């Protein structure tokens, strides 16, 4: 048994490479008469992948000495006697546990009892079988056994369990590495997610500061000083070049939280206008919308319309594409003075209570401005966030010629309610389709701090879906 322990240790020691060299010459003569023994002797010489199988077979062979020829055993003894075992840290190398106390293995269950006994027998009968193939075969055979065939192994496993309990009364199974690996992996994933969120927040903060910087040229632009020449006002330069990712840009600009909306992650916002009656939203437009940061611009859009930013209208239009800027915000943003050449004039009966209106998204074509005030009209008030004035890209088309920009006009308009006065959020998608979300304010008559006071509101009417 001492020699068996030495054999297992020499497999794990640096001298293990010497042992195969000694085994190979000695095992060569035994190939002829004893194919099984010679085969097992030769299997010690291949690479370390076979060491586990060779060690098992050598340990099994020590029980019956006739498995290995005399020359093999003499060669092994010669190698082991010449090696200084104090050079090898045995506890660490053999069981991998802490040096203080050796690792106690769990008692074998019934299948392990069966597999260990059957593996020895099969390895003796079929020495050429690979260990993995043996394991597969043993598993299949075990599943085919009935209860009566399994009973002896179950009884032996129970006996081993009781013996193990006697030998190690305070034994507690403590799986070591697998659990820690999973925990470490989970910890690695969590900081990754936090880092991703942190990166997104940093990008959004960057865009927010960029918009604050762009606000100052925007304050001098015609959008805020009442100059009707909006193309020159927009030539102050769009805040972002076309190559800028739209997700961060829009997340830094749009604040859907004010309407109680929750935006979806995948660019398809789940819009829940709490008290707003929405028409059917065009799926194409919604799919083209990028993700928004819900909490980013709440400071710019106070719920009750603080006079510092928006005195009487708690809304702001953020233009994110040349087309939509023309479509929506231009009449609202740029043409503030009453004398602006708008295709429409505000309806005679604009209700001061500002019923929130929506327009149905009409796939049949771009919405058109109509001159006669009707119930599906929406009076857009001037958007009074001058620091977003420069957010509009320069427009090269006539001011309200946006029919070619919008294949499907997703204006939210309802034909069943009185026309309401509210400013529009224009969230521009990548394909430059404006999406109007309306915010109503019950006091739309007060003066505005950063923009001219009440100018005549342009009235937009759109065709509803047939």
UniProtKB/Swiss-Prot annotation:
Keyword Transcription regulation part of the UniProt annotation: yes
The keyword Chaperone belongs to this UniProt entry's keyword annotation: no
Biological processes per GO annotation: anatomical structure morphogenesis; cell maturation; cellular response to progesterone stimulus; cellular response to xenobiotic stimulus; central nervous system myelination; developmental growth; digestive tract morphogenesis; enteric nervous system development
Bias-annotated ranges (Polar residues): 440-466
Residue ranges annotated as motif Nuclear export signal: 134-145
Region entry Disordered, spans: 1-67, 160-199, 212-274, 354-375, 433-466
Domain remark in the UniProt entry: The transactivation domains TAM and TAC (for transactivation domain in the middle and at the C-terminus, respectively) are required to contact transcriptional coactivators and basal transcriptional machinery components and thereby induce gene transactivation.
This protein's name: Transcription factor SOX-10
Species assigned in the record: Homo sapiens
Originating gene: SOX10
């Amino acid at each position: 048994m001492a020699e068996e322990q030495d054999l297992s240790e020499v497999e794990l020691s640096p001298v293990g490479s010497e042992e195969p060299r000694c085994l190979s010459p000695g095992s060569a003569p035994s190939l002829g008469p004893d194919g099984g023994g010679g085969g097992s002797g030769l299997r010690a010489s291949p690479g370390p992948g076979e060491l586990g199988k060779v060690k098992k077979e050598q340990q099994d062979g020590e029980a019956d000495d006739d498995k290995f020829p005399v020359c093999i055993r003499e060669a092994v003894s010669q190698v082991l006697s010449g090696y200084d075992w104090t050079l090898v840290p045995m506890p660490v190398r053999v069981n991998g546990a802490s040096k203080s106390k050796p690792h106690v293995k769990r008692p074998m269950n019934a299948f392990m009892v069966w597999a260990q006994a059957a593996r020895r027998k099969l390895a003796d009968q079929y020495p050429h079988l690979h260990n993995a193939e043996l394991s597969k075969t043993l598993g299949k055979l075990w599943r085919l056994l009935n209860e009566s065939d399994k009973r002896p192994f179950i009884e032996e496993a129970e006996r081993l369990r009781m013996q193990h309990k006697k030998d190690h009364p305070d034994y507690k199974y403590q799986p070591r590495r697998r659990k820690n690996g999973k925990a470490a992996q989970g910890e690695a994933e969590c900081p990754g997610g936090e880092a991703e969120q942190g990166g997104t927040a940093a990008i959004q903060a960057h865009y927010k500061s960029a918009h604050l910087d762009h606000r100052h040229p925007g304050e001098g632009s015609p959008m805020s000083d009442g100059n009707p020449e909006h193309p020159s006002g927009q030539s102050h330069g769009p805040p972002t070049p076309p190559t800028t990712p739209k997700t961060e840009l829009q997340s830094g600009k749009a604040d859907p939280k004010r309407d109680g909306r929750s935006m979806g992650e995948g660019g398809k916002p789940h819009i829940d206008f709490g008290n707003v009656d929405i028409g059917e939203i065009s799926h194409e437009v919604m799919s083209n919308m990028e993700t928004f940061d819900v909490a980013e611009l709440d400071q710019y859009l106070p719920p009750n319309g603080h006079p510092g930013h928006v005195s009487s209208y708690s809304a702001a239009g953020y233009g994110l594409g040349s087309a939509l800027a023309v479509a929506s915000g231009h009449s609202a943003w740029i043409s503030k003075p009453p004398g602006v050449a708008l295709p429409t004039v505000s309806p005679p009966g604009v209700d001061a209570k500002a019923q929130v209106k929506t327009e149905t998204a009409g796939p049949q074509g771009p919405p058109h401005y109509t001159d006669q005030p009707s119930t599906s009209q929406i009076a857009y008030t001037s958007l009074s966030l001058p620091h977003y004035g420069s957010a509009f890209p320069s427009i090269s088309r006539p001011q309200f010629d946006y029919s070619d920009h919008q294949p499907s006009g997703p204006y939210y308009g309802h034909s069943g309610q009185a026309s309401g006065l509210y400013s529009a959020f224009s969230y521009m998608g990548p394909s430059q389709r404006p999406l109007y979300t309306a915010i109503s304010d019950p006091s739309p008559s007060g003066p505005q701090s950063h923009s001219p006071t009440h100018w005549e509101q342009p009235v937009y009417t759109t065709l509803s879906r047939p």
